[in-house]
Amino acid sequence: IGAPWPSSRKWLNRFKKYDYYNVVKNNMQKNRIGNGGFSLRSRKFLEFCSQFENCNGVPEDIFFCILNYEEAKKHKINFAPFELAYKFSSEHSFRKLTNKHPVSKSKFNFQNHFGWHGKRFLNSDKLMNLKYEN
């Protein structure tokens, strides 16, 4: 885990069948899961990554999860679906990622996301504006 250790097993149980999950900031065609601010990686995913000497200046989530997506699938890396990954962590608002409102009508709260860059803001109005920005 590359960020604060999860404090609740309820989150880990939701995601444990996937080797890597998180939302890539751009809408990619093959895979939209990357490192949007917080990511968990299985041992299998780390072993897959270790075959590469470096990322050649490409951000690691793009390098491993987009550019080498097909190779990862050959190594049986299991990426979480976008909808589940978004609930785990996101770097951008759902609207910005999908051009539509979230499926859930519930307002943003810290229980809905396990990790998110927006948590660095203390002002909840600022959070809401970032979460649902155009």
Q: Which residues fall in each region the model found?
A:
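Conserved donor-nucleotide/metal-binding helix-loop-beta segment in metal-dependent transferases, i.e.
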Residues: 1-28
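Catalytic core and acceptor-binding pocket of nucleotide-sugar-dependent glycosyltransferases
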Residues: 27-134
